[in-house]
Regions:
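Active-site/pore-lining binding-face segments in mid-to-C-terminal subdomains
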Residues: 123, 131, 178, 182
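Non-transmembrane alpha-helical segments in soluble domains
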Residues: 76-77, 81, 102, 167-170, ...
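C-terminal "capping" alpha-helix adjacent to the active site of nucleotide-linked donor transferases
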Residues: 158-177
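A charged, aromatic-enriched C-terminal amphipathic alpha-helix characteristic of glycosyltransferases
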Residues: 176-207
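Conserved catalytic or regulatory cores that recognize and/or transform ribose-phosphate-containing ligands
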Residues: 144, 150, 162
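C-terminal helix of von Willebrand factor
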Residues: 11, 164-168, 201
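Nucleotide-sugar donor-binding catalytic core of glycosyltransferases
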Residues: 1-125, 132-146, 196
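A short acidic/histidine/glycine-rich donor-binding loop in glycosyltransferase catalytic cores
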Residues: 150-157
Length: 210
């Protein structure tokens, strides 16, 4: 499981043993993508499901599922989708689902990975595709446990600073530091989150249990 241990035990019984295993990057899908400098740089990509922030919808969803509804789980991602310099794709009912997701990512220099409660697979798919990743990393979602480093392998954002961080990039998009951070994030993601490494870790776990 690639969730933080504290989150894992919020979902599963306390007596379940926990072992962190990262996976999700199928290396062959992230080869030969468009070079960073040839990508869209005046827009930031935001993708995945978001919540409906209309007042009545939030009330209904909070009654049905007060913690795990799509808005509560994706608060920052939902807010980002409203910005005029952000291109939003639902990745549902289009050409960029599942194995084709890297083909969407390669169009943009930058993309957003945001989740309220825990980092998800998007956090390493985005840098694996060579994008500069704007990652929601907070005390609540324990994003530090992924190993990414702010301003070295990604750019950390939260609900207070996300607009400022986006503008810092957009106002200086030609600065070579963005490409350097994207490349460092790419190297880190491909090395630590590829499926071969995940299978190896799972095999080690199985050996421990036998």
């Amino acid at each position: 499981n690639f969730f933080p241990e504290s989150f894992f035990h919020k979902v599963y019984p306390k007596e379940f043993n926990y072992k962190k295993i990262f996976y999700g990057v199928e290396s062959s899908l992230f080869k030969d993508l468009k070079p960073f400098n040839d990508r869209i740089k005046n827009k930031i990509l935001n993708s995945g499901n978001i919540g409906n922030d209309k007042f009545l919808n939030k009330i209904i969803n909070d009654i049905r599922n007060p913690k795990w509804n799509s808005y509560r789980c994706k608060i920052l991602r939902s807010k980002c989708s409203k910005l005029n310099f952000v291109d939003y794709f639902s990745t549902i009912n289009n050409d960029y689902v599942n194995d084709h997701y890297p083909l969407l990512l390669q169009k943009y220099q930058t993309a957003i990975a945001a989740d309220t409660y825990t980092p998800v697979q998007k956090y390493w798919e985005i840098p694996a595709a060579g994008c500069l990743a704007f990652m929601e990393v907070t005390e609540k979602n324990e994003g530090l446990h992924t190993g990414f480093i702010d301003n070295e392998t990604s750019i950390f954002i939260n609900e207070k600073n996300y607009v400022q961080k986006f503008q810092e990039y957009l106002e200086d998009a030609n600065n070579p530091k963005w490409k350097e951070i994207a490349q460092a994030g790419n190297d880190f993601a491909l090395k630590n989150f590829n499926n071969d490494a995940g299978v190896s870790s799972l095999a080690d776990l199985m050996a421990e249990l036998i």
